[in-house]
C-alpha cells in the first residue's frame, strides 16, 4: 500500500519545493535503472544542479527497489557522498527545456551504492552531463543521526 497518492512521494524522501524531478518516465528493475524527466527552472538552471538532478533520480531508483521488495514505510533518506567524476557539457540548463536523467545502479550493498548517471536533452538526446555518484543510506537513519550529534 503506497504511503501517499503521489508516485514521487512514495519513492523520494524530498518534498516540494525541493523535489526537482517532474516524473518517473521509465523503470527497469532487472537493469537497475530509472529515468526521470526534469524541466529546468530559473532557480535550478546552473550546470552544477545536474548533480542534484542525478542524486534525486538515484534516490527514486532506490525507492522503487524498496517498494518492489515490499517496503511500505516512508521513503528512506540517503546521503550523497560525492562523485568520482562529473562531466558537464553545458554552462546552464535552458529554462523551460525538458531533460531526461537516467541513473543505473553499478554497485549496491546493505548501505552504500554507486550510480552511473547521465543527463540528456529530451529534444535530441544529446548528453549534457554525466557522473558516477556514490551514496550512503543507513539502515537505521535515526541511530545514525543520533550518533552524529554525540
For each predicted feature, which ranges?
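Small-residue-enriched segments and motifs
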Residues: 19-22, 81, 101-103, 131
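A short mixed-secondary-structure module that forms the rim of ligand-binding clefts
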Residues: 41-61
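HotDog/MaoC-like acyl-thioester-processing domains
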Residues: 60, 94-100, 104-150
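Catalytic strand-loop segment that frames the active site of acyl-thioester-processing enzymes
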Residues: 13-48
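Short aromatic-glycine motifs in intrinsically disordered, low-complexity regions
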Residues: 3-15, 74-75
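Hydrophobic beta-strand-centered segment that forms part of the acyl-chain substrate-binding groove
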Residues: 61-100
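A residue-level detector for short acidic-glycine micro-motifs
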Residues: 23-28, 85, 90, 105-107, ...
Amino acid at each position: 500500500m503506497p504511503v501517499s497518492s503521489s508516485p514521487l512521494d512514495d519513492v523520494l524522501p524530498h518534498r516540494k519545493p525541493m523535489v526537482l524531478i517532474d516524473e518517473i518516465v521509465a523503470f527497469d528493475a532487472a537493469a537497475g535503472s530509472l529515468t526521470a524527466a526534469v524541466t529546468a527552472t530559473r532557480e535550478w538552471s546552473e550546470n552544477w544542479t545536474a548533480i542534484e538532478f542525478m542524486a534525486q533520480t538515484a534516490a527514486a531508483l532506490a525507492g522503487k527497489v524498496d517498494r518492489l521488495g515490499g517496503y511500505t514505510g516512508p521513503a528512506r533518506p540517503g546521503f550523497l557522498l560525492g562523485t568520482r567524476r562529473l562531466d558537464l557539457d553545458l554552462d546552464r540548463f535552458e529554462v523551460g527545456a525538458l531533460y531526461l536523467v537516467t541513473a543505473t545502479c553499478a554497485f549496491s550493498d546493505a548501505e552504500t551504492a554507486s550510480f552511473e548517471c547521465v543527463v540528456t536533452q529530451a529534444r535530441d538526446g544529446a548528453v549534457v552531463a554525466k557522473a558516477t555518484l556514490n551514496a550512503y543510506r543507513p539502515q537505521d537513519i535515526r541511530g545514525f543521526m543520533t550518533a552524529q550529534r554525540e
